Amino acid sequence: MSNKIAILLLAVVVAVVACAQAQPSRRHHLVHPLLPRFLPRLHRDSNGHRVVGGFQIDVSDAPYQVSLQYFNSHRCGGSVLDNKWVLTAAHCTQGLDPSSLAVRLGSSEHATGGTLVGVLRTVEHPQYDGNTIDYDFSLMELETELTFSDAVQPVELPEHEEPVEPGTMATVSGWGNTQSAVESSDFLRAANVPTVSHEDCSDAYMWFGEITDRMLCAGYQQGGKDACQGDSGGPLVADGKLVGVVSWGYGCAQPGYPGVYGRVASVRDWVRENSGV
C-alpha cells in the first residue's frame, strides 16, 4: 500500500510540474521595460521599440515626436506637451540621472538634425511599478524653452478619463525596431492601428499579467503592425490627441497580442498637477 501511495504522489508532482512548464510565465516573457519597447517588449518589455509594419514619415507629420537620448544614443520616444515639458514612459527614465538625458526634436532622424535639448529633471509617476509596468509615465522638464515650428509642436491631450472607443484608428510613431529582431530604424516611422477593448486585451495577456485601467491596447488580431523595441515612451495619437504612451507587449506585431500603452487619460490630472499643462 505504501508503495502505491508513493507512486501516486510522484505522479501528482510530475503532473503539477508539467502543467507549470506548459503555461507561459507571467513576467518573463515580458519585454523588459527598457528593453521592452525599450527592449523586449514583452517580457513585459519596456525597453524601446521600433515601429513594425509601418511607413517612413517626416517629422512634420508628427511634430510632437522626440527622441529621448541617453549619453547621445537613442533610448526611447516621447511627446512634446508644451515649450518646457515632454511625456515619456517611466521605464525609460527610471534610475537615470537627468544630466545623462537629452531630447532631439524637429528631426526625422534620431541621430542628427533638429535641436538637442538637455533634460533638467524627470518626474516619474509615484505609483509606477516596474514589475507590472503599471503607471508607466514620466514627465521631463527641459533645460531650455522650445521654439515651435512646422517640425516642433505640442500634442493635444485628452480630458481626464476621456474614453477611446474600441476600433478607433490611432497612429504610433518612433525609431524602434522594424522587426521583432534588433534591426532599428534611423528614420522616423509610423503605423496605423486600431484600439482594442480592455476585455479583449485582458484575455490576450491573461498569462502575462493584469491589463490595468492605466493601460490601453492597440493592434490587429492578425498582427503585422506594432511598436517595438526603441519606440517605448513614444506617442499613440488618435483624432489629434495623445491617447497612449508606448509601454510593453509580447514580442512585436505578434498575432493575438496587441501593443500595450500607458493610457494618458487615466493620468491627465497628474500631468496637469506636475507640469501645469
UniProtKB/Swiss-Prot annotation:
Q: Which residues form a coiled coil?
A: none
Please tell me in which tissues this protein is expressed.
Answer: Midgut.
GO molecular function annotations of the record? serine-type endopeptidase activity
UniProt KW Zinc-finger keyword: no
EC numbers on record: 3.4.21.4
* Gene Ontology biological-process annotations: digestion; proteolysis
Propeptide residue intervals: 20-50
Signal peptide range in chain numbering: 1-19
Give the main location: secreted
Q: Which InterPro entries match?
A: Peptidase_S1 (IPR050430), Peptidase_S1_PA (IPR009003), Peptidase_S1_PA_chymotrypsin (IPR043504), Peptidase_S1A (IPR001314), Trypsin_dom (IPR001254), TRYPSIN_HIS (IPR018114), TRYPSIN_SER (IPR033116)
* Intracellular or extracellular location(s): Secreted
Question: Keywords assigned by UniProt?
Answer: Digestion, Disulfide bond, Hydrolase, Protease, Secreted, Serine protease, Signal, Zymogen
Marked site, Required for specificity, at 226
Alphabetical GO CC annotations of the entry are: extracellular region
Keyword Secreted included in the entry's annotation: yes
EC main class here is hydrolase
All disulfide bonds of the chain are 76-92, 201-217, 228-252
What does induction of this protein depend on? By blood meal.
Q: Which reaction does it catalyse?
A: Preferential cleavage: Arg-|-Xaa, Lys-|-Xaa
Q: Which residues cross the membrane?
A: none
**Active site residues per record:** 91 (charge relay system), 136 (charge relay system), 232 (charge relay system)
Q: Where is the Peptidase S1 domain?
A: 51-276
Q: What does this protein do?
A: Major function may be to aid in digestion of the blood meal.
The similarity comment for this entry is: Belongs to the peptidase S1 family.
Q: What protein does this entry describe? A: Trypsin-2
Q: Which organism is it from?
A: Anopheles gambiae
